[in-house]
Amino acid sequence: IALSTPNGVGNWFHKTWVGAEEGINDWNFIKLHWNLHPERNEDWRKEQDKLLGPSLAAQECDCDFITSGQTVIDGVILDEYREKQCQDPLEKRGVDSNLWIWQPPNYTKDYVLSADVSRGDGSDYSAFHVMDIETMEQVAEYKGRMSTKDFGNLCVNVATEYNNALLVVENNNIGWAALQQCIDRGYENLFYTSKDLKYVDTEHQINNRYRTQDRNMVAGFSMTMKTRPLVISKLEEYFREKSVIVRSNRLIDELFVFIYNNNKA
């Protein structure tokens, strides 16, 4: 027996519930809505909104996965993205078939490849996304497990294929192992950040390329206590304003479980 209120989507309880509804696992599902209780009515439900807030009230009262959970990006928005924008890739490449392609390179366009590096020991995934800079459309994605060295090489190979895309690799901890591969292979359009994190000159970066000998620059992007809230705020803004085009169901699944915990994402 597994007893719970909904708490977002993409987690074990949600996947097990959906599987039971579709009849693809051995679980039976029973939904007990709040209005089955003889002493509860619409006035009680409205009072729960006031006491708990709309999101937590949806979680505790409505048996609604989409509007439950403290997701950074509103679940309704993510569901809309899945319905209207997500597509099967045109091609799946690589030994693990985890490099998904929605659009081949257009050599009149500029692209950015943003990469997040995992340890490569099976406990987490490394991932990157390739975006068309002008249209903000996702054109390729990788999510899988491989060594940091192999992942660094894959980043360089795909960035080179996509018109020498601006290659942005997070440089925290294990990210340096993948970054070193990019540096050793002499990839020219590698993203550099100022060491004091006071600025990121995007126009200069894209058009002129930073020189690796600039002493005030460090390879990659540093996700710190200073930059993380800014990145998360901009991510939420892009989705809320529909400024970005997302093709990947895998990415939407990840965002459904990207939640606030003690006011931190």
Regions found by a protein language model. Name each.
Residues 106-132:
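Gly/Thr-rich phosphate-binding beta-strand-loop-beta motif of the actin/hexokinase/Hsp70
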Residues 1, 27-29, 111-112, 127, ...:
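Beta-sheet entry/capping signal
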Residues 37-115:
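ATPase catalytic-site recognition across NTP-hydrolyzing enzymes
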Residues 25-26, 107-109, 123-125, 161-164, ...:
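Short, well-ordered loop/turn elements at secondary-structure boundaries
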Residues 3, 30-32, 61, 139-142:
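Hydrophobic residues at beta-strand termini and immediately following loops
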Residues 9-12, 16, 132-264:
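Mg2+-dependent endonuclease catalytic cores in nucleic-acid-processing enzymes, primarily RNase H-like
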Residues 1-52, 178-184:
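ASCE P-loop NTPase helicase motor core
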